[in-house]
Amino acid sequence: PASLIARCFIAAHDSDSGVERWRVYTAAGADDPGGVTWGDLPTAKRVHVSPWGLPGSYDPELDLLYWGIAVPLPYTRIARRGTWDVGDRTPCELYSNSTLAIEPDTGEINWYYQYLPCDDWDQDFVQERTLIDTVVNPDPKAVRWINPTLRGTAEERKGVGVMGEPGGL
């Protein structure tokens, strides 16, 4: 029911006391960085952009959590915004259909990558992030789904795999 639809979040709790240490909302609020990507939609209506209850992944070398985030509701732009025209589409409706890299001590978003801005097709990107150590030199002509900012250097450690179709780096 519509009464159960809410703004989603990821939270960390103290393992001894159970007290919440931080909370990061998975849809940028009106006053948050990235909030303008939702247009005039009130923060309370930026819903269902969820991690689905799936676990995140942790990189101990970089001390980062990686979490996959789902689609917004309703499923089409016209239902969410009342129009198909959303202007500049990239990024759009952050942090839907994204990977979030989160600082585990503070809950701050270190970086994000949005796979499908302004999703109208219910294309979830929430599966666990598979962390790999490898050097890649991607050719965007040969690999359909690839982060165009990746470059083949040993220093680059922002490669996070989303396995399955339409998975990619």
Predicted regions and their residues:
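Soluble metallo-hydrolase cores and metallopeptidase-like ectodomains found primarily
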Residues: 49-51
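Extracytoplasmic
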Residues: 5-7
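Short strand-connecting beta-turns/loops that link adjacent beta-strands
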Residues: 61-62, 166
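Short loop/turn segments immediately following the C-termini of beta-strands
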Residues: 1, 25, 70, 166
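Extracytoplasmic/lumenal domain signature
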Residues: 9-42, 46, 78-125, 132-160, ...
